[in-house]
Amino acid sequence: MNKWVQNVVSKWKTEGVKINNGTSLGDIEALESVLDFKFPDDFKDFYLAIDGFKDLDWQEHMFYFWPLEKIIEEFNESLDKNFIGFCDFLLASHYIGFKKNQTGIFKMYSISDRAEDNSIAQTFEEVVGMINSRSDLIY
């Protein structure tokens, strides 16, 4: 397991977050095929270690990292087919995810809306750190 992922998982386990077991590379690649999108390596490292949180659980700042199954569910419900979410704040107050046509990590405030134009982070690893440190940019 990648060191940064190991540190994040350890932190969440200490906090009592209910974490799913990791997924397989095959499942990630199948999702990439369905979404017509290639996830970055840091995202893959994370999901190989944990497939999001269980039972809508969230970490201390109320962010819920989705299992792969929920990523596709939310994508199918969203009107913005350029946005691929992977977590939400306070049970869908807003979403954090990728854009298919732009590098970085973005926010979207409603599944009936479009993601913001400006990225809040450059990498998945960076945004996980921002979420865990409660950066103002994630709200």
Language-model-derived ranges and their functions:
Residues 87, 112, 131:
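Residues at the C-termini of beta-strands that transition into short coil/loop
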Residues 1-100, 138-139:
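A surface-exposed partner-binding patch
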Residues 53, 94-122:
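Segments surrounding the PLD/"HKD" phosphodiesterase catalytic module and close analogs
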